Amino acid sequence: MCIRDRADWVAEFNATIAGSVQSLRTNELNPWVIMLTSLGNPTSVIIMVILIASLLGFLRHWDDDIFFTGNLIGAVVLVQVLKLCYTIERPTENLLIARPESFSFPSAHSACCLIMCCLVALLIIRALRAHQLSVGLEVLTWIVFIAIGLSIGISRIYVGVHWPTDVLGGWLIAATWLFPTITWYLSQYPRSRFGLPHAQHEEYPVLP
């Protein structure tokens, strides 16, 4: 009985939230949300990771490069393993895009895009601090990138390919993943190397 009640509660929650989000659909808004959700597609993410990793490598910021790339690879692997563990099927109705073949929970778009946005924001903020720019600009950077990451998650509900609990699960995974990894990274590399002359880079440790 307890399991059945819990399943009913989750189903009701998913139906209520999905209905509310999808009630916002309009012919004008739909193409924009579809474009937004496509930013989290594997091809888009791979291209962005390659570009950012290449830039960090070009600047010879190997510690930042390994931290950024390793974080995302680890997160992708974790999400895919969890999908195979839970084997929850995706929604089949009210779809605006093709239904992916993979399992539904947790949402890879929600988890990985939020992780990537937070990591990019962190790297940008460390660069800003190296140039002693305002705290207000740092706060704005966090707000913008977190909003983008969350918006991609919500877009998955909007286009109908994920349950709301999938998205919430993805966000929870992102937060659980980011807290220890960022804490460790900042403890190992407390000062940013962005903006420093090349000769000064040797003063800072790099990952083996």
Language-model features: locations:
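N-terminal transmembrane-helix/juxtamembrane module of multi-pass inner/ER membrane proteins
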Residues: 3-44, 84-97
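Alpha-helical transmembrane segments of multi-pass membrane proteins, especially transporters
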Residues: 19, 67-72, 167-171
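Membrane-embedded catalytic cores of phosphoryl/pyrophosphoryl-handling enzymes
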Residues: 95-208
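Short hydrophobic alpha-helical membrane-embedded segments
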Residues: 41-47, 142-146
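Hydrophobic, membrane-inserted alpha-helices
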Residues: 31, 47-54, 149-153
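Membrane-interface loops
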Residues: 12-15, 48-49, 55-135, 206
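Residue-level signal for helical boundary/lining positions with a hydrophobic bias
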Residues: 36-37, 83, 105, 162
